[in-house]
Amino acid sequence: MEDLTRYEIQDSLFPTDNELEIPTLRLDMQPKSCAIPFVLFGEARRSFKMQGQGTLCFYTDDYRFQTVYEHPEKIVAMQPANIVEPNFSLYDETPIAFGMQQIYKKRWIGRAMQMKGIRVFVDLCCSPKFYKLNLLGVPRGYQSFCTRGYNHQVEHLAFELEIARMVADGRDLLFVCYGGGQPCKDFCRENGLIYVTPVVEVRNRSLRYDKMKEAVAFFGQEISMTALNPKLNDLPRLEEMMGERVEDFSDKHSIAVSERKEATNG
């Protein structure tokens, strides 16, 4: 097992711009593009290294990444260029006091990662109840945001985009939507955003294609589906679909392979 002590981060009180002392993110350490590959925490093996490339996100069940607040070195050890702040869940039923702790944790992790040279997308995915509080520690002029899309809640995506525009204060926006299916992808296309298809959706689609290509029983005989329909040979392969997971609908060419840089402490 890898020794993570060399990646350890000292417990710190970071600079803040609010009475609740939630850390303030650095404007100079926000992503300038959506670095690929776009990786979901816990999806790859523990020893996986991004080697200063790509973007790491946390749009999965909380239990899969709960330990990253106590052990942020787990993130540093993966060596991403960018991260999306950990999405500690905030629901309508979440008490405000508990929700503030969740917001503190993700913003602390974000600031700590910036200190380590990792650029940070602000996570906007939360219950509307927390939309305003979720901006504590996000300075005006911040331009890089990400959210989780849901196909039955496109109106939430639209509102979160308006929040991002308000914070960016007229500056060019880098906005990424992770998942949500065709309704969210269409919204991204209409509004010039970046859409990321989750790996699980790509794999499920590949499995459906594989089943279409399988031989089928037909009057007691095994007949190839591709013999019945040669176009099935042209269905995309898994590798091709993986390569098309991140789609940039903006006119800014906002997808890049890598943009890691070292940062000074602060």
Question: What name fits each language-model region?
Answer:
Residues L4-A77, V84, T94, K185-F187, ...:
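Non-catalytic, usually N-terminal nucleic-acid engagement modules in DNA/RNA processing proteins
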